[in-house]
Amino acid sequence: MGVSSRARWVALGLGVLGLLCAALGVIMILMVPSLIKQQVLKNVRIDPSSLSFGMWKEIPVPFYLSVYFFEVVNPSEVLNGQKPVVRERGPYVYREFRQKVNITFNDNDTVSYIENRSLRFQPDRSQGSESDYIVLPNILVLGGAVMMEDKPTSLKLLMTLGLVTMGQRAFMNRTVGEILWGYEDPFVNFLSKYFPDMFPIKGKFGLFVGMNDSSSGVFTVFTGVQNFSKIHLVDKWNGLSEVNYWHSEQCNMINGTAGQMWAPFMTPESSLEFFSPEACRSMKLTYQESRVFEGIPTYRFTAPDTLFANGSVYPPNEGFCPCRESGIQNVSTCRFGAPLFLSQPHFYNADPVLSEAVLGLNPDPKEHSLFLDIHPVTGIPMNCSVKMQLSLYIKSVKGVGQTGKIEPVVLPLLWFEQSGMMGGKTLNTFYTQLVLMPQVLHYAQYVLLGLGGLLLLVPIIYQLRSQEKCFLFWSGSKKGSQDKEAMQAYSESLMSPAAKGTVLQEAKL
């Protein structure tokens, strides 16, 4: 086989290979997006065979609860009508462990479960210990006084007598552990005995009683196996399709997810909605910006200005009233009537009147705004920091001597941050399976298409060059034949008689 023949077959082979590569690239361009979508849907639904099921069942990411207290520096002056001065103490950090138990798959494409939660103090991450003493408003005294304000004078006098007998004061000096996880107080038994409708609490009293070694109730959520459009959405909480704490149907609705995973394939127009049993309501976060977390593209969602706006600023929130200044939410209806308010830390994004009424507050968007960074393709959180503040409304109540001359004020008690970020083996698995592989497939389809196009050019160029050589050879042969004929004619003319005479004459000259 000659050299030209081998070259022809090589060019033809490369052309066939290029055609196959180009065809495969086109097929991948048409099919890969659908394949990636199917793979994502398969792995984010709540199903024992899905990649994310283990992550959903027992969160492998270390979560931390960081608590900051607002210690009252001038309690005596506050009782005399002066402005409160507070000093931030903390953080007191707890590692949070969560595990779903009693998982039951139902026939209507839902799954029911209880999520057990436990908190363990982390001394190495904390600025202090659980034995630190902190001066705070006595919630039982000052909160109870506000709750009794419209009651008959005789009841208020009975309450005052009970407070005096038990040595209760407007402000208390207790340890971090007691404030959070509860303390024995005879006044609690007194209140539950004489005012059972107003104070249906028994045993220990603490701000976070019921949050440790406990659960947030029974959740029933959609799995997304049969109906993807409802994936992760809460169907019921404790058997309820809506709560009854608020004064409008919209505010009582249980919307969104349980706050751990959301529907995949988000866009900047998507919102992040979830139901929070601790806040007794559903919340909605909005898109702020696109970011990158450890090489993974994310969307950052933050709290809009309307989250805790009052009804006059944002009419849909009217159902959460009675309201005070904008930026705080009255949660008394789900906290036994106690005048407690929820907001962002240091009254960030709230009416400035609130932070100006208390010395020592410095709202800062970098320090006090909440955010969730979500991988938009899967709806799985990569990095989150949820920050909330709990405040108590206090004032002087006529008939309750312990309230002195306290001016009406929403006084911050503490703020807390629940934070966590994906890392380690979990992050590597997530990145490889749900980010790297789709990216490889995405780029491979265009590489194959480009390579196929280049290889297809090989036989085309070879054919063009072969035709050019043939043309040059044919042209060269034709020209050579014409020159040979001309030379022969010229030689014959020289041998003729006339030509000979001419030559001799020229020689003589």
UniProtKB/Swiss-Prot annotation:
Cytoplasmic side: 1-11, 462-509
Claim: Oxidoreductase is one of the keywords in the record: no
Membrane topology: Multi-pass membrane protein
Function: Receptor for different ligands such as phospholipids, cholesterol ester, lipoproteins, phosphatidylserine and apoptotic cells. Receptor for HDL, mediating selective uptake of cholesteryl ether and HDL-dependent cholesterol efflux. Also facilitates the flux of free and esterified cholesterol between the cell surface and apoB-containing lipoproteins and modified lipoproteins, although less efficiently than HDL. May be involved in the phagocytosis of apoptotic cells, via its phosphatidylserine binding activity.
Biological process, per Gene Ontology: aflatoxin metabolic process; androgen biosynthetic process; blood vessel endothelial cell migration; cholesterol catabolic process; cholesterol efflux; cholesterol homeostasis; cholesterol import; cholesterol transport
Post-translation changes: N-glycosylated. The six cysteines of the extracellular domain are all involved in intramolecular disulfide bonds.
GO cellular component, one term: apical plasma membrane
Keywords annotated in UniProt: Cell membrane, Disulfide bond, Glycoprotein, Membrane, Receptor, Transmembrane, Transmembrane helix
Compartment list: Cell membrane; Membrane, Caveola
Family the UniProt entry places it in: Belongs to the CD36 family.
Molecular function GO labels: amyloid-beta binding; apolipoprotein A-I binding; apolipoprotein binding; high-density lipoprotein particle binding; high-density lipoprotein particle receptor activity; identical protein binding; lipid binding; lipid transporter activity
Disulfide topology: 251-384
Positions in the Extracellular compartment: 33-440
Bilayer-crossing regions: 12-32, 441-461
Listed InterPro entries: CD36/SCARB1/SNMP1, CD36_fam
Quaternary structure, from the entry: The C-terminal region binds to PDZK1.
Full protein name: Scavenger receptor class B member 1
Top-level taxon: Eukaryota
